[in-house]
A protein has these predicted regions:
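Positively charged, low-complexity terminal tracts
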Residues: 1-76
Length: 76
């Protein structure tokens, strides 16, 4: 099985999510998330267990809810 990458782009923010196959039978696949933006240094997050993905999802939802009101205020 090959790796699979999905890329999302909005304004100057680029997010790439790459899923890598399990290296050995019985092992879980892993996920790498790469974020690029002109205002931030390039960063990577690597997950190799399902609970880590759930924690990241919760963190991402909280981030979106925190910054959505700020974006709406700057659009005025």
């Amino acid at each position: 099985m090959k790796s699979h990458t999905i890329e999302f782009t909005r304004d100057d923010l680029v997010v790439r999510i790459t899923r890598y196959p399990a290296g050995e039978p019985g092992k879980s696949p892993s996920v790498e998330i790469e974020v690029e933006s002109s205002g931030l240094p390039r960063s990577f997050v690597w997950f190799d267990r399902e609970p880590q993905l759930f924690a990241f999802k919760e963190m991402l939802e909280e981030y979106i809810e925190t910054f959505r009101p700020m974006k709406d205020e700057t659009a005025l």
